[in-house]
Amino acid sequence: MGSVVAILRVMPESPDIDLEKLKKALKDALPGIKDIQEEPIGFGLKALKLAAIVNDAGGETDALEGKLNAVPGVERAEIIEVTLN
């Protein structure tokens, strides 16, 4: 099995959340994160778009979403793209 790059969008719970603290919490929860960018959504809310390298074994992407959704301050994490590493 190889690895893939998963691109995810993470929506914070509110526009008032400290995005730098959330970025650190996400990196702590998932060491495979390689890049995090802020993406304006509207009304002051910003999503975080991140790239993570994960094993391409079955169920790994679901587990990835689960880990990120469990981070305090995350409203929702969803995979928007998966590509070969």
Swiss-Prot record:
It holds the Pfam family EF1_GNE. Coiled coil: none annotated. Keywords: Elongation factor, Protein biosynthesis. It comes from the Archaea. InterPro entries: eEF-1beta-like_sf, EF1B_bsu/dsu_GNE, Transl_elong_EF1B/ribsomal_bS6, Transl_elong_EF1B_B_arc. GO terms for molecular function: translation elongation factor activity. The keyword Protein biosynthesis applies. Promotes the exchange of GDP for GTP in EF-1-alpha/GDP, thus allowing the regeneration of EF-1-alpha/GTP that could then be used to form the ternary complex EF-1-alpha/GTP/AAtRNA. This is Elongation factor 1-beta. It comes from Methanoregula boonei (strain DSM 21154 / JCM 14090 / 6A8). The gene is ef1b.
